[in-house]
Amino acid sequence: MKVTFLGHAVVLIEGKKNIIIDPFISGNPVCPVKLEDLPKIDYILVTHGHGDHLGDAVEIAKKNDATVISNYEICHYLGKKGVKTHAMHIGGSYLFDFGRVKMTPAVHGSGILDGDSMIYGGNPAGFLITLERKKIYHAGDTGLTREMELLGEENVDVAFLPIGGNFVMDVEDAVRATAMIKPKKVVPMHYGTWELIFADVELFKKKVTEMSVECVILEPGESLEL
């Protein structure tokens, strides 16, 4: 299974089914690919409704006849645009044909900007994905939360955690989150896309390495094999 970081919070998982998380491709200043470069996508996971995460979900879904997995409110919004959806909510899990997805708590917003209006986008979330005997945790956008301690019981293989501060955890809090989650590997994300969310990724790596957690810094377009 190949897991590719495409910048910001975009993660592409290529295996028996191809899954993309938070598909902010167009307009993403650090994404190295264009929409036409993506492989066939079977599922799209959206953590919350902000434009830098909902991104190109509609276009990708329609082009590939892909199913969007997100909260009920986002799925309702996308369903009206002709997109196939599977609605879930925090704490819920479902066994798909590629594996199991569980929605986990996130502390953030989820409003959907539609023209001049802000539409209620439900509650933000993270995803715990179990597939091909591996567990991947994508935190979405979130601050530090005590619920992360429960993930420490899940034997997570790789955790994607935001570290950019301002809107999400900063380096210090992401280190604390890593200590609670106890993943085998951690990949920092949601930093450096814009100056506002600059973070010292090497400091993050140093601190989590001291906790005996492997930190994998992926530049946009780089992959790891699970």
UniProtKB/Swiss-Prot annotation:
Which NCBIfam families has this protein been placed in?
A: PRK00685.1 (NF001911)
The GO terms this record gives for MF are: hydrolase activity
* Record keywords, A-Z: Hydrolase
- Source superkingdom: Bacteria
Query: InterPro entries, from UniProt?
Result: Metallo-B-lactamas, RibonucZ/Hydroxyglut_hydro, UPF0173, UPF0173_UPF0282_UlaG_hydrolase
Concerning its family, UniProt says: Belongs to the UPF0173 family.
| UniProt cross-references to Pfam families, sorted A to Z | Lactamase_B_2 (PF12706)
The cross-references to PANTHER family, in alphabetical order and at most eight, read: UPF0173 METAL-DEPENDENT HYDROLASE MJ1163 (PTHR43546:SF3), UPF0173 METAL-DEPENDENT HYDROLASE MJ1163-RELATED (PTHR43546)
HAMAP family xrefs = UPF0173
TM segment ranges: none
Task: Tell me the protein's name.
Answer: UPF0173 metal-dependent hydrolase Tpet_1587
The record, for SUPFAM superfamilies, names: Metallo-hydrolase/oxidoreductase
